[in-house]
Structures are given as C-alpha cells and as structure tokens.
C-alpha cells in the first residue's frame, strides 16, 4: 500500500474552509468538488502510460505520452457525502464509469471506546462489472472506522481489478491502520490523517458530518 498525503497549499486552503463551522452549504459542496478534481489529477499522475509520437498541424512530429489506463476507470461513490467529491473526480476523469454504494451508521448501537464495533448498514449497491483491466477508485471524503470502505473493497476485490485506489479528504489514524493491515494492495489518496474518533464514530478534529453539511 502507498499512502499519498497531499499537502499542496491550495488543497490545505480548501480543507481549512471545509473544517470551519462558518462555511455555508453551497461553499462546502463547491470545495468538495474542487478537492475531488485536484485529487483526480493526482491519481492520473500514477497511472500507466506509454510514449507515442503525434503529428502537429505544421506537419512535424512531437513526442508525447498516452495514458492508456484512462480507458478503464471505475469510480465507486459512497453516498451521500461523496456526491460532490465524485463530481470533482469526474471532471478529471470524464470517461470513468460510475458505481454507487449507500450505507449508514447505526449510531445508537455505538459502544464507547470500541469504534470498530460501529455497525454499518449497506442498503444499496450498484456497481458495473469489474475486469482485470480496471482501475477502481472508491471515493469517500471522510473515512472514520473504515467499515464502509472495507465492505466496498470486498465487493470488488474478487474481480481482480488492475489496481484499487481510495480517494478521501480526511481519514482517521484508526481507519488508515485498519485498511492498511487488511488491504495492503490498496493505495490511498487523502489530504489529512486526523488523530481521533469520538464514540459516535466522528473524526476529530474532522469537519463534522459531511453529508449533512453538504445537503442539510
């Protein structure tokens, strides 16, 4: 597993705005779109490519590259917080196929001090057929315990895609450790690794409930 913690100032600027309790709903969604787009381009930079020659309008040859992996991209969106985030990813990866997973936490069942016991109910899943040529990007802006992400990875891993990426904005140290131990073949792109999870399963310092802040 490779962990990419992206720390460009523009990314941290947008993240700081997202963390603030004073950001309005529309700006919150727009920032998730912006971050998704930039992270999408960062992912593209790691894809396989080949050198090619092209002919310019002036009849001369120019050397370039062709990123052939772009032809086989599948993005899986973890609803609902990932919706604007995936909108940004699709701006960087406009030919990607799209799947969705809808899940919810059963917060009333949470046990203090045992974040791994927070149950997750996956109540809808629609994912296109996955092949060994595919690069799969599972997108969830907030990864706390990693329970939903674990179920998403397990739903496609038996199809043996070429590679699996996780795209997020914030991931907790606990969720990161858990995913790295169970899925060492998955690469993770994020902007921040936050240190704590509270007994409701929210990341601290985090940015609150991303779904509620984006959609009310």
Swiss-Prot record:
Pathway the protein contributes to: Pyrimidine metabolism; UMP biosynthesis via salvage pathway; UMP from uracil: step 1/1
GO molecular function annotation: GTP binding; magnesium ion binding; uracil phosphoribosyltransferase activity
UniProt-listed Pfam families: UPRTase
EC code(s) of this entry: 2.4.2.9
Documented activity regulation: Allosterically activated by GTP.
Cofactor annotation remark: Binds 1 Mg(2+) ion per subunit. The magnesium is bound as Mg-PRPP.
InterPro entries: PRibTrfase_dom (IPR000836), PRTase-like (IPR029057), Upp_A (IPR034331), Ura_phspho_trans (IPR005765)
Keyword Metal-binding: no
Keyword Magnesium: yes
Reaction(s) this enzyme catalyzes, per UniProt: UMP + diphosphate = 5-phospho-alpha-D-ribose 1-diphosphate + uracil
Family designation: Belongs to the UPRTase family.
HAMAP family tied to this protein: Upp_A
Protein name: Uracil phosphoribosyltransferase
Protein source organism: Sulfolobus acidocaldarius (strain ATCC 33909 / DSM 639 / JCM 8929 / NBRC 15157 / NCIMB 11770)
